[in-house]
Amino acid sequence: MATTRLKSLYQETIVPKLINQFQYTNVHQVPKLVKVTINRGLGEAAQNAKSLEASINEIALVTGQKPVVTRAKKAIAGFKIRQGMPVGIMVTLRAERMYAFFDRLVSLSLPRIRDFRGVSPKSFDGRGNYTLGVREQLIFPEVEYDSVDQVRGMDISIITTAKNDEEGRALLKELGMPFRDQ
């Protein structure tokens, strides 16, 4: 498989830039992307099997990988959920698929959000990982407007090897993540 544009950009220009910025003594100290996880909670999936199937197809179309169905660990009467019922779907992307998805997310999908001024720089977890929520699946060019039965969002988590938020923010900014100015 050929190297993606973003991965070659990372290896050729971003790594030397981060080594100079943070005074790393070893190339392996430079933060890198580990994985990207996409999660979608489906409250109505317990009653409606078609919505589960539609979500699986949409996420598979967007990521290029079939998602795993997450199931309820225990019964909750208030939500009308029994143990083992499907409550969401999740997919973990690594290596080439991760770089390809991240590149499409940053260059194609995020700019298609209405009134987009950048993503919040406050969504880091303290260890250099970043999470963002997407309100509708229509921002992805792979999803056709006519095939959508209901607008659903998803959570996208970007896991890095960065030791703190500052390193993680520098890595994602170099990779093209459009952070909002504070």
UniProtKB/Swiss-Prot annotation:
Query: Per UniProt, which keywords does this protein have?
Result: Ribonucleoprotein, Ribosomal protein, RNA-binding, rRNA-binding, tRNA-binding
Query: Which Pfam families has this protein been placed in?
Result: Ribosomal_L5, Ribosomal_L5_C
The entry's cellular-component GO terms read: ribonucleoprotein complex; ribosome
Return the InterPro entries for the record. Answer: Ribosomal_uL5, Ribosomal_uL5_bac-type, Ribosomal_uL5_C, Ribosomal_uL5_CS, Ribosomal_uL5_dom_sf, Ribosomal_uL5_N
Its domain of life?
Answer: Bacteria
What molecular functions are annotated in GO for this chain?
A: rRNA binding; structural constituent of ribosome; tRNA binding
Q: Please tell me whether the keyword Ribosomal protein is annotated for this protein.
A: yes
Gene Ontology biological process terms, A to Z: translation
Family matches, as PANTHER family: 60S RIBOSOMAL PROTEIN L11-RELATED
HAMAP family per the record?
Answer: Ribosomal_uL5_B
Q: What does this protein do?
A: This is one of the proteins that bind and probably mediate the attachment of the 5S RNA into the large ribosomal subunit, where it forms part of the central protuberance. In the 70S ribosome it contacts protein S13 of the 30S subunit (bridge B1b), connecting the 2 subunits; this bridge is implicated in subunit movement. Contacts the P site tRNA; the 5S rRNA and some of its associated proteins might help stabilize positioning of ribosome-bound tRNAs.
Q: How does it assemble?
A: Part of the 50S ribosomal subunit; part of the 5S rRNA/L5/L18/L25 subcomplex. Contacts the 5S rRNA and the P site tRNA. Forms a bridge to the 30S subunit in the 70S ribosome.
Q: What is the designated name of this protein? A: Large ribosomal subunit protein uL5
Q: Species name for this entry?
A: Nostoc punctiforme (strain ATCC 29133 / PCC 73102)
Gene encoding this polypeptide?
A: rplE
